[in-house]
Amino acid sequence: MTDSIHGGHPNIIRSCGASESMWTASHALGLYLRVSNIATLTIPTWKAKFKKSSASHFIRTAVVQVMLKQPAMRVGIIGENSKQPRFVALSSVDFSQQVEYAEAPSVDSVARSLEKLLLQPWPNLSKRPGWHVRVFHEPSSADKDVCRLRICLTVHHAIFDGESTARFHTSLIDALNNPDPAVARMMDKSPVVNLTGDCRDYPLTQEELINFTADIFWIASELWNILAPSFLKPFTFQTWAGEPYNPDIQAINIRYLSLNPIVTQAVVKRCREEKTTMTNLLNTLCATSLARRVPLTERQGFVNLTAVSLRPWIPENLHPNKTCMSVCASSHAQDFGPDVLAKIRQAEDATIWELAVKLRQDMKRRTDTMPHNEFSYLLRYAGDWRDIFQARYGKPRRELWTLSNLGSIATPASKGPWELESVLFAQFAPVVSCALAVNAASVEGGDMMVSLVWQDGILETDLVEGVRDDLEMWLLGLGNEGNLGISSSM
């Protein structure tokens, strides 16, 4: 779509910010299409007031109730394949298209469906929103005490970040337990919701919300690290990160593990006792597993990225922006050099905890100085993201994995028959970024689930499945027996 076409659109809200434009470019090039979050909701069977045939309508009504309170769910995007993509206010949303219904007997079957769904581009974004809900029900649930629905939300990353997907599900639970009669009457008439607002309450860009600052020497150093050829940086280690960047995505693979509430709470408690966090423990365990499974040379190491929410740095006078679904996130890179990998390759539990503590200290040093010298500051100099991404095709990647941990998702304060049982957060890293995406989320007092998502052919399936098995074995050991059980002879 050309600038002349989208420039005349009558409902333009604002231009996409630098970070948002990164995701519109990724979508335009087919490099990154959707973020997903699957929530398992339960309701006692005797309280369920709907039959399977009407469940979709019941959920649709609740989704409408959420949408009417969230500007990000009422916008489209124009000019994705240009230098100036923009958000536009939609005049209507057809919920027969946005909320669909399907059968799935298990989380496994939902994950298989999601592998295909994550590769679907968003259709007609100038007239349709960049979100979709697929409601999965268990076909044999009639004889159970609990009716279980799995709500699969997928979103365009320029509109939602991971934290926003969690907010959607908690808002949906609240809407299900506290239905608005006016919304129900509206949905009884037609699945098409007409929108009259202009979305002037749409959240600001993170660059406008947060006062990013930077030192000139830091800027020069970061640009050197990004742009300078490797032969001019002889003291850095060689990175191993799977196959080179390949824009031809043939398939996406998803594997996951689940920890019950007792194990989850035991692991969280132990992390606190060791003065680290679940995020840093997961990064340490990923590094340990990969170091033992990847055939590395003595000069090779890993680099990982950890997602960081920027919402804590939004000023209090802009507080409404903290609760809106939007994009407000960055990441922090951490190196695992050859010396570190050699150590953890032969390490036992004590050494693993030492590294998890060091990662926590490093992360704290970073967040203590934010938003000063934060990578988001550099995005203003990026130019056209499409050119940047295309220039990376076929080149070796730097980062091996990215970790995004949504933490413990609090259930709504208002009580009702609908409850949030678990959440499976799943996104794959952009083609021109990490080879593997590790995503974690838990429900307050409930299960924790960890997904591993990767582009087919970039990493060997056996390698990722081995990492998944290691994480599960070590975390279950920690939760049940009190120790990770990592042996130097593994």
Curated annotation (Swiss-Prot):
Any one Pfam family match given in the protein's UniProt record, by short name: AATase
Gene Ontology terms, MF aspect: N-acetyltransferase activity
Phenotype upon loss of function: Results in enhanced production of cytokinins.
Annotated family: Belongs to the alcohol acetyltransferase FCK4 family.
Organism (species): Fusarium pseudograminearum (strain CS3096)
Protein name as annotated: Probable alcohol acetyltransferase FCK4
UniProt keyword terms in alphabetical order: Transferase
Enzyme's top EC category: transferase
